[in-house]
């Protein structure tokens, strides 16, 4: 009789422990949960470079992009195309889209996709490649300031 009561107590204790631990949220190594991206993830100024080849030869560029956090980006860049330099070339305002998986697209005002983008490190860095026909151009951008710091 005594061992039966002891067995019931052990089973009850084990059941209670199992039920109480089933509501513990998952633990992540960095202490943060997975985060989704949105247009707000790209917010502020980013220094960038681009490198690769175009239908007219090699391309290298560096510049600055300003993201408003609401889906619009503009900037300026200096470019070397096949060894011919052009400085302070404006990048006109255009829309960008961001998916929850932190992939993004740069678009023209008419909606034509011109670049694919991957947002990394919580929006502190971006990787991109050109989708212009004849181009094999990639780039990297790093956050300089948030939009609040740019004002």
Label every model-predicted segment.
Residues 1-5:
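Positively charged n-region of N-terminal signal peptides that target proteins for export
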Residues 8, 23-151:
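Mature soluble binding/inhibitory domains
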Residues 9-20:
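Bacterial N-terminal signal peptides
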